[in-house]
Amino acid sequence: MTTMVKTGKWIAKHRILIVLIGILLLIPSVIGTIKTRINYDILSYLPESLETVKGQDVMVDEFGTGAFSMVVVEDMPLKDVQKLKNKFEEIEHVKKVLWYDDIADISVPTSMMPKDLKNIFFADDSTMMLVLFDNTTSSDEAMEAVTNMRAIVDKQCFISGMSGVVTDIKNLCLQELPIYVAIAALFSFIVLEITGTSFVVPILFLLCIGISILYNMGTNIFLGEISYLTQALVAILQLGVTMDYSIFLLDSFEENKKRFPGDKNRAMGHAISNTFKSIVSSSITTVAGFAALCLMTFALGKNLGIVMAKGVIIGVICCVTLLPAIILIFDPLIEKTKHKPLIKNTNRLSGFIIRHYKIWLAVFCIGLLPAVYGNNHTKIYYNIDKSLPSTLDSNVANKKLEDTFDMSTMHIIMMDKNISNANRTTLMKDIEKVDGVKWAFGLNSVFGANVPASMIPKDVKDMLQSDEQELVFVCSKYSSATDESNSQIAAINDLVKKYDSNGMVIGEAPLMKDLQDVTDIDLVNVNVASVAAIFIIIMLVFKSISVPIILVAVIEFAINVNMAIPFFQGIELPFVASIVVGTIQLGATVDYAILMTSRYQKERRKGFGKKEAVMNAHKACALSIMTSGFSFFAATFGVAWYSKVDMI
């Protein structure tokens, strides 16, 4: 008797103890889940070595601010706008609000204002103020400030900027997350009921997987924080990826009950041993695929990869400990609620596929070229607010800013304050000549190069100048993450470096430009690493070169087909999809490939010919694979159908 069989029998004998321990472990898991901070700013995962990221940190240190929002106020008397500004400044974590009254008295008619100044703060019947926060864009403090600002404004006011977008993402995810989980569970339940043989089994499967998901989410406390994408996706992905382990265990238990009639503990002991042997290699390949995400310089990959890999490991442990205990406890109920399966077997399907294998090979060869072409030409977008509903407050405000003031984004230039007045003036003029720049706002542009420092309002000077650095705000007509915006940022950066080699262009659009540059490289690295890792593991498991070549080729073909479909539909994908979908699909489906191949080799060892062995393997595995695959599809499809966040 093997050690694993003995362990399995021990688990079966002490099933009540196992379940009690499982329930008790839920307490720290729930606490850990609640205590784990959720990060709603994707841009915060960019490498800290990037100049744009360093610039944000320097800005916080030098100026006490790292995030800002543009507020558009429509059809409101200037006195009321001034009162609103004062209310904003009283809100905790609002560092400073810059408006026209910081530079001139509001009693001066707008018609008498200098044209440059008027263009910055006024357009038609609207005015704009710049609200600076005392922390970074994704900080809880900045989001709290935006929420409090929204609470005191009416329909005449529109709060735009990245802090508003991040706040809306948080609110939307908090609202939708419980529904994601409910939909995924419901759709998986329906599939399991259709393909299963007992009304109770799907409930037990979902219960055990739900517990393992809670364990996974609870242990995230050791990471400090996880991204909102990780939080939203991991539960559904863990449900789909680990479902097949549960199915394998139950199938093995049913087989061993026939081998050992009247001895359920012995049957379960052997089922645990068989299941562990079957899933250990496939789970290692899945973990390796997800772990490849950790190689990304964009730290979201590491965050997602660690949590997903950890989820698979926890899922395997629960599958060979907690699930057997639950199944044994409820086995009498399982027997009472058994029914005839709607799909008894796949014999006819298997026969059709094997008889016409040449047709499927032809389909593979014919479809390969358009699949690869479509995958390589699928359009990707990097603009985060584009993935959100247009009705959200932040998107409405951004659209209002664009329509009213003809501006989409604001760049910040941080440069040495000791640059000569002549060079500073030349730099400002050159920046305003860059394509798509509407205006540049700095001390020189507002007060002139010859105005003594003593005559500049202290609040404005403190906001734009520190002991060593000076800020210039640059208004751009171009949306973030577009070719025009990226070219504009590059041109401005070249101008700044001409006068200050340590000068920086920072803000939302520069960060998104870096995001595009970083993830383009990461995409290649992750794909190569995940394929290489899985290839090597399969090669070691099967002691063959041809097997990993065949399995990886088939899965990569499926990934290319999947990623090519949006191209032929004319749909743009969010950048996250291009990075993680392939890795997730590779990690999730390699289990099926290993299961089918292992069964084929087993049939060959029994003496069957190649065709008969493939036929037998297909008949034995197809239903389990289809059940798990359709369950995964149903869960992810349900979430995609409901979610208002395109990235999810």
Predicted regions, residues:
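Membrane-embedded transmembrane helical bundles of large multi-pass transporters/channels
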Residues: 1-38, 137-382, 497-648
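Structured non-transmembrane domains adjacent to transmembrane bundles in polytopic membrane proteins
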Residues: 48-67, 73-166, 379-547, 553-572
